[in-house]
From Swiss-Prot:
Induction: Rapidly induced by auxin. The modification Sulfotyrosine is found at Y67. Disruption phenotype: Reduced hypocotyl bending and dose-dependent altered root gravitropism with an impaired formation of auxin gradients, thus leading to an irregular waves root shape. The gene is GLV2. Belongs to the RGF family. Residues 27-65 form a propeptide. 'Golven' means irregular waves in Dutch. Transmembrane segments: none annotated. It is found in: Endoplasmic reticulum. Residues 1-26 form the signal peptide. The modification Hydroxyproline is found at P75. Keywords: Differentiation, Endoplasmic reticulum, Growth factor, Hydroxylation, Secreted, Signal, Sulfation. This is Protein GOLVEN 2.
Length: 79
């Protein structure tokens, strides 16, 4: 005899499994975010140290930025 599972019970079981497993994924994502923020903080401290030691200046950063002038013509489709 084969046991026949209805679609509704299969769907309910699938949703239950997804509901139970979602908090564990959220906890692991929280750890990833913490690790990323630590990396960002470390990188910013390194860049401050380099600037303080004379390895770079703020003026160089302004020259490297992509700047569009204020009087740039708008595209035709926006007129």
């Amino acid at each position: 005899m084969a046991i026949r599972v209805s679609h509704k019970s299969f769907l309910v079981a699938l949703l239950l499994i997804l509901f139970i497993s979602s908090p564990t994924q959220a906890r692991s994502l929280r750890e990833v975010v913490r690790n990323r923020t630590l990396l960002v903080v470390e990188k910013s401290q390194e860049s401050r140290k380099i600037r303080h030691e004379g390895g770079g200046s703020d003026v160089d950063g302004l020259m490297d930025m992509d700047y569009n002038s204020a009087n740039k013509k708008r595209p035709i489709h926006n007129r």
